[in-house]
Each structure stands twice: as structure tokens, then as C-alpha cells.
Curated annotation (Swiss-Prot):
Keyword Acetylation found: no
Record's keyword annotation contains Manganese: no
Residues covered by the EF-hand domain: 14-49, 50-85, 87-122, 123-155
Protein name per UniProt: Calmodulin, flagellar
Keywords noted in UniProt: Calcium, Cell projection, Cilium, Flagellum, Metal-binding, Repeat
Length: 155
């Protein structure tokens, strides 16, 4: 993808850096591509259970060159499109449920640490606390749905 195609999607350098980090979480063997197997591993770690057919569909949706895998350029295109989708409230609700393990309507530091750990992100207590602090508007040391939505919309 050309630089202008990326800039047409209006991704900031910071967003591209964040997506690079996310991409490397999916790209388990570090070969620069995401396979259906790698995608499945990450989705299962997030509590999803996609079928092989669903994984192929997800890859095919963004696999511009048709080689059966997603490279970083294709991943960026997918993320840029996702960010443009205004109808992502349902996705945000689903993401909140993934983090809110006990279903009490709040994401605690422990729940955040658990999900990040499943994603392969080993965070220190300080890093987890910092993430909570950044999103925690009312100062109760946990993230409610409204705070989560605000945080997701800022991305």
C-alpha cells in the first residue's frame, strides 16, 4: 500500500505504531504475515471460538493479494476501514464483555491484566494501573462502560 493510501485513511503515526504492535501479537512466528492458525490462536485467547471457515472468511475479507494470509499493509487497511465504520457500537459492547469477565459492568485492573496476558502482553502492575487511570474518568479505579466507550472512540 502506498503512503498516500494510508494517509487517505487518515491514520496517525501513533495509530500505525499501535497497529504494528497489535499485528506482532497476531504474527506469532514473526514472519510478517498472519495465518488463519495465528488468527485463531489470538481469537481463542480472547474467549472467541471461530470455526476454520470463519477464520478463512476473516482473512479473505482483507487479503488483497489473495495469498491466504494478512500482511501488515492489509492489516492497516482493515484497521483503517474498521475505524471509519461508525456502526461499531456493537463491537465495542462485545469488546467490553471480553474484558468484563465477571459481568458486573466494570473492568477491574485484575480483569484488564488477565485479558492483556492472554494476548501475550506481559504488563507490570504499574502499566495496568496506568491504563486504568487513563480511562477512569470518575476515579473509582475501574472502567465502566461509558468510560470504555470514550476510551475506544479516542483511539
Amino acid at each position: 500500500m502506498s503512503r498516500e493510501a494510508i494517509s487517505n485513511n487518515e491514520l496517525t503515526e501513533e495509530q500505525i505504531a499501535e497497529f504494528k504492535e497489535a499485528f506482532s501479537l497476531f504474527d506469532k512466528d514473526g514472519d510478517g504475515t498472519i495465518t488463519t492458525s495465528e488468527l485463531g490462536t489470538v481469537m481463542r485467547s480472547l474467549g472467541q471460538n471461530p470455526t476454520e471457515a470463519e477464520l478463512h472468511d476473516m482473512i479473505n475479507e482483507v487479503d488483497a493479494d489473495g495469498n491466504g494470509t494478512i500482511d501488515f499493509t492489509e492489516f492497516l487497511t482493515m484497521m483503517a476501514k474498521k475505524m471509519k465504520d461508525t456502526d461499531n457500537e456493537e463491537e465495542i459492547k462485545e469488546a467490553f464483555k471480553v474484558f468484563d469477565k465477571d459481568g458486573n459492568g466494570f473492568i477491574s485492573a485484575q480483569e484488564l491484566r488477565h485479558v492483556m496476558c492472554n494476548l501475550g502482553e506481559k504488563l507490570t502492575d504499574e502499566e495496568v494501573d496506568e491504563m486504568i487511570r487513563e480511562a477512569d474518568i470518575d476515579g473509582d479505579n475501574q472502567i465502566n462502560y461509558t468510560e470504555f466507550v470514550k476510551m475506544m472512540m479516542q483511539k
